[in-house]
A protein has these predicted regions:
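Catalytic binding pocket for nucleotide-activated donors in carbohydrate/polymer assembly enzymes
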Residues: 629-630, 730-734, 761-842
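Glycine-rich, basic loop-to-helix element that forms the pyrophosphate-binding segment
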Residues: 75-92
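Short aromatic/hydrophobic "clamp" motif used to bind/position activated sugar donors
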Residues: 97
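Active-site and donor-binding regions of nucleotide-sugar-utilizing enzymes
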Residues: 374-375, 475-481, 486-645, 668
Length: 898
């Protein structure tokens, strides 16, 4: 820009920001703009207040008074981000305009870096800046944006028509030529919401220009704030129906259709961008929690109709080669085949698992339409699979693909589908790539590497990576005395930090009735359950994390737990020095009623215990989301049900003196598990501000509930979920409410004492029903939780149709149901008693026995254990210490193994 232009008051940059109720972030935004090292006389800020109801306007006007030459503030009625930005654009005078969001920040040299690049590359049509993720809660900056690859290699100008893996669609982190926007009458389209209005404008702008020349300026760093309360437009968009209709129709589809009409084919960079956008629709569903989706009913139907049309504009080779962000093969198969209304199947089958004990191999392949005609040729003969199922692969309310799963005998094997043999592979092959980019070619076709003179470690050795403790454990675990004690051991555990669940009940059964089994129980030393079990005389209780635990785990053949968390199934301390060879039995913590398939499918579960026919069918049957078949899944009942039945029979109707209120947790209440732990900590101030705390405390403090309990002669008890118990001591509970914890009480006795049980979604209700006690469900957040807001998705169980008691949606309704139940007495109403009987037709006290037999049966006739090569004894000081410890360990193990 010439000095003459500057003297005339022209601006190089216009920063347009649409402001709506972001007062808590505005000071950071203002400070970031004020801190720019670029001449302020070349910059203007146009802040459009979009009808804010907080103090945003007051803050902006104060800024305008302080910086009148920089800041212009205008206001309008609330109409959305697009209309606010468009208003600002009409007022802009800058050569280049950007649309910085008011809850984000820019680094001090942001404008300077962009200006330097533009002076060097004046042919640039669009500038994209580098988005750095800002954690709102911690303030930590992380360079982990999914498109950070676009900024590798320094600041570059890319012709994205020639380099179609590059694109840019974020208007706040982009700079546009104002004259081009005006020439082509380009503005934000308010019909494209709640998201993608940025990408829609960026793409139309690039399609309108003579060249698609995008400058990727990595040194201009834009701090994108990820809000801790998940309240940003992007973070909340998945719960908005327009995300699944208007965005596809007015955004993706209009771009593809318009560009195809002009040139006969949508540009490849645009196809890549749309595939990138579509990938988030899939990944949002592939979460353990099963993210909420508004794509249900009519919205789901329209979403899939639009997606089907979108796929007609996407080239097969572009879909197949897409790797700009991780893209599961199944997502690509859906885009390629699910919407074409013609049968299809993989031209191969994978063999993802082998069970040597049962002599079976697992085969799987995906298909669309009807199941192909199958011929499993084993040892030269056509055989039927020992176990088989069809798994449905569904997204946003529609089954799009199927996976065929079959277990067949482990012999020479061939599979024919519709009369043609298919490849058998250990894993799915990559898609054929018909176009290679220069960088790919350089990586794939390299000149021969020079031979390194650096000595390489011996193949397969792990000793240099092991601590001396792990080296000692690795050596001791292979010695004869240790193997005599722990060889072929069955390790049982509930949580790391507590017991008193199905694993403990099965352990007790084994020690009393199956002494031939080398059974051990694991729990953290010093916990109440550790002290209790040791006080009862159980010497075979091993402290989690101890050397003894490591030796036990290195030699066990069965790991049996009521929990399937990684610290239980794949403990890092064991993986550090040993390769597990155990079979894993999942006893479960309760009866599964929701769809937990995304969480459980990746886990290596050899035996999966279920308790009801509905639960079994929902996991092992056809046309559900689980990857488990009749091979792994068995209907036995939970081991803890045996003792529960005994306890239930101890307390007659006159002895049931408790209204037990026991809600489950919510995944947004607590932080993630720490590595190697099963404990979670909650901030009390954050907890009390939640709807969860407000509703449950309102129920516990209800005067009507207190009066009803007093009239019925019962006590109100509160038993929060273990993940929430850390706040129990700080809750201001009324004096008539008695607080219980899982650590300090026999919870089965609490269940048995209950005249009434109140919960929200907890599977504890199945325990209560098992002993014929009444239940009330309090589901104030049912729309959120049941549509994927918590762990899992809606499953086969419908609380109104299948539940064991009435369902309330607010505090008053819950109190009314509780009062009615107390008037009726401590037994379920007839309609719910009938459901209980249908759910549990067999209650015979033999669940432990059935589980034991299934573990024996699933292990097969052959021993799972493979001969272990002895670990060389440590040398030097470590060796002397090890030999001394070995003598001590042998004496200790002889006593402990009794």
């Amino acid at each position: 820009m010439s000095q003459q232009s500057i003297r005339e008051g022209a601006k190089r940059f216009s920063i347009i920001t649409a402001v709506y109720n972001v007062a808590r972030y505005l000071e950071d935004f203002i400070a970031a703009v004020d801190a720019q090292d670029y001449p302020s006389e070349l910059v203007e800020v146009i802040a459009v207040n979009d009808g804010s109801t907080d103090t945003s306007l007051e803050i902006l006007e104060g800024w305008q008074r302080r910086r009148p030459g920089l800041v212009t503030v205008v206001s309008k009625e609330n109409g959305g981000q697009s209309t606010a930005r468009n208003m600002g654009l009409e007022l802009a005078r800058g050569e280049w305009v950007t649309f910085t969001d008011p809850d984000d920040m820019i680094e001090p040299d942001y404008l300077s870096e962009v200006d330097t690049f533009l002076r060097a590359k004046p042919q640039t049509q669009l500038v994209g800046t580098n988005r750095i993720m800002l954690n709102d809660q911690t303030g930590v900056l992380t360079d982990n944006h999914p498109l950070r690859m676009h900024f590798r290699g320094g600041n570059r100008l890319r012709n994205i028509d020639e380099l179609p893996r590059f694109f840019h669609g974020t208007a706040p982190a982009a700079f546009f030529r104002r004259d081009l926007l005006n020439e082509h009458q380009l503005r934000f389209d308010p019909r494209v919401r709640p998201n993608f209005e940025d990408g829609h404008l960026c793409c139309r702008y690039l399609l309108a220009g003579a060249t698609a020349a995008v400058g990727f300026v990595g040194t201009a760093r834009y701090h994108y704030r990820k809000r801790g309360d998940a309240s940003s437009t992007l973070q909340t968009s998945l719960t908005n129906p327009d995300r699944y209709t208007a965005v596809l129709r007015n955004g993706y589809l209009s771009l593809l259709r318009d560009s195809s009409e002009k040139t006969g084919r949508a540009p490849e960079w645009l196809q890549n961008y749309i595939i990138y956008e579509l990938s988030w629709y899939f990944s949002s569903q592939d979460t353990h929690a099963g993210a909420m989706t508004a794509a249900q009913g009519a919205v789901s139907e329209e979403f899939h109709e639009l997606l089907a049309e979108i796929t007609t504009y996407l080239d097969d080779d572009v879909i197949a080669a897409f790797d700009i962000r991780p893209m599961k093969r199944v997502w690509k198969e859906i885009l390629l085949h699910a919407y074409r209304n013609e049968p299809w199947h993989n031209p191969f089958a994978v063999m993802p698992a082998l069970d040597q004990q049962q002599g079976l191999v697992k085969l799987s392949y995906n298909f669309v339409g009807d199941l192909p005609v199958e011929e499993f040729v084993v040892g030269g003969k056509v055989v039927a699979p020992r176990h088989a199922k069809i798994r449905d692969i569904s997204y946003h309310g529609r089954t799009l693909l199927h996976e065929r799963i079959a277990w067949v005998p482990l012999r020479s094997l061939r599979l024919r589908l519709n009369g043609r043999a298919v490849d058998l592979r250990a894993s799915a092959p990559g898609f054929p790539v018909t176009t290679r980019q220069v960088g790919d070619i350089r990586r794939l076709v390299r000149p021969p590497a020079r031979r390194s003179t650096k000595p390489r470690p011996a193949r397969g050795t792990t000793e240099p990576r092991l601590s001396w403790e792990d080296r000692l454990a690795a050596w001791l675990s292979t010695t004869a005395p240790v193997r005599r004690v722990y060889g072929d051991a069955w390790v049982l555990m509930d949580r790391i930090h507590d017991a008193d669940d199905s694993a403990e009940r099965l352990f007790r059964y084994l020690r009393h009735k199956r002494r031939n089994v080398n059974a051990w129980f694991v729990v953290e030393e010093g916990t109440p359950d550790w002290e209790r079990l040791r006080a009862e005389g159980y010497l075979r209780v091993v402290a989690h994390g101890s050397l003894r635990w490591k030796l036990l785990m290195a030699n066990c053949t069965q790991l049996i737990s009521s929990h399937a968390d990684v610290p239980v199934m794949r403990p890092p301390a064991i993986l550090a020095f040993a390769t597990p060879s155990w079979r894993f039995t999942f006893l479960q913590h309760g009866v599964i009623k929701d769809d937990l398939s995304e969480w459980l499918n990746p886990k290596q579960i050899d035996l999966f215990i279920t308790s009801t026919q509905q639960e079994y069918d929902s996991i092992a049957g056809d046309h559900n989301a689980y990857a488990f078949s009749s091979k792994e899944t068995k209907l036995t009942g939970l081991p803890r049900f045996d003792r529960l039945l005994e306890q239930g029979q101890r307390f007659g109707p006159e002895e049931r003196d408790l209204v037990l209120i026991a809600p489950t947790w919510r995944n947004w209440l607590v932080p993630s598990l720490a590595v190697g732990s099963q404990k979670r900590q909650i901030k009390m101030s954050d907890f009390l501000a939640t709807d969860y705390a407000r509703n449950w405390l309102a129920l516990l403090r209800s005067p009507e509930l207190a009066e009803a309990a007093e009239r019925s002669g019962v006590t109100i008890g509160f038993l929060p979920h273990p993940n929430v118990q850390s706040v129990l001591a700080e809750l201001d509970l009324p004096p008539h409410v008695r607080a219980f914890t899982y650590h300090d009480n026999d919870v089965q006795e609490l269940f048995a004492r209950s005249a009434l049980f109140v919960t929200d979604y907890s599977s504890i209700a199945f325990n209560i029903a098992y002993i014929d006690r009444p239940t009330v469900y309090f589901q104030f957040d049912g729309e959120l939780v049941l549509n994927g807001g918590h762990v899992g998705r809606r499953g086969y169980f419908d609380y109104v149709r299948d539940g064991f008691g009435p369902v309330a949606s607010d505090v008053d309704e819950a109190v009314s149901h509780i009062v009615d139940s107390l008037k009726r007495g401590p037994v379920p109403a007839p309609v719910y008693q009938q459901r209980i009987q249908q759910t549990f037709p067999l209650r015979d006290g033999k669940c432990c026995e059935r589980v034991y037999k299934e573990i024996q049966r699933s292990s097969g006739p052959a021993s799972r254990r493979q001969p272990k090569r002895a670990t060389p004894a440590p040398s030097g000081l470590v060796g002397r210490v090890a030999r001394r410890l070995r003598r001590v360990a042998v004496a200790y193990l002889k006593r402990a193994s009794r």
